[in-house]
Amino acid sequence: TLVGTDKQVSEATREAIIEAQQRGKTVAIASGRSISGIRRTAAKIRLEQFGGYVIAYNGTTVINCKTGECIYNQTLDHDMIKPVYEAAEKELGLGITVYHDEEKELLAGNGVDAYIEADAKACDITIREVNDLVRAIDFPVNKLLLSGEPEKMKQVEKHLCEKFGDRLNVFRSDPYY
């Protein structure tokens, strides 16, 4: 793991990665976070300078940091957003968010909880609450993020796997997501 429990790259790790890049090694970092959420870490280990890569959204997006080119991008079928939103809101009573990297914001439907606030802070993005999340999404989406109490999220994962597992990858990235 690149970052510690404090979500920071240690100085020793930073120096080792930079040294490896100086020796000609190519570095890629992978995260479940959005591109915006990884940019500070990428800058800290100087991926842009050395031509490294960022793999965001649990592998759905790959960016060449030197050129800024997106070399791989797998988005959700837009027709899946409404059923997942309805399941989150009506069946489960959960917060659901969508990253909008171009605007450096997190769109939140069905309210904002402490977990959404923590994610926005960690990713250095703003939160924009919307009344109709499905209608507000007029851009490609890589990931829908549901949040709630850890014990409840275990059941949520099971429920959503049963409901959408044949069409979507459903998993928890943290106890509360």
Predicted regions and their residues:
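Short, contiguous strand/loop micro-motifs
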Residues: 3-4, 71-72, 143
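Short secondary-structure boundary/capping elements
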Residues: 8-12, 54, 125
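Short beta->alpha junction loops/turns
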Residues: 6, 77, 149-150
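Asp-based phosphoryl-transfer active-site loop
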Residues: 1-7, 84
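Conserved acidic, metal-coordinating active-site core of Asp-based
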Residues: 87, 91-177
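Short alpha-helical
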Residues: 8, 36-37, 151-152
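Active-site phosphate-binding/coordination module
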Residues: 13-114
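Short, flexible helix/strand-to-coil boundary loops that buttress conserved ligand/catalytic motifs
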Residues: 6-7, 42, 66, 157
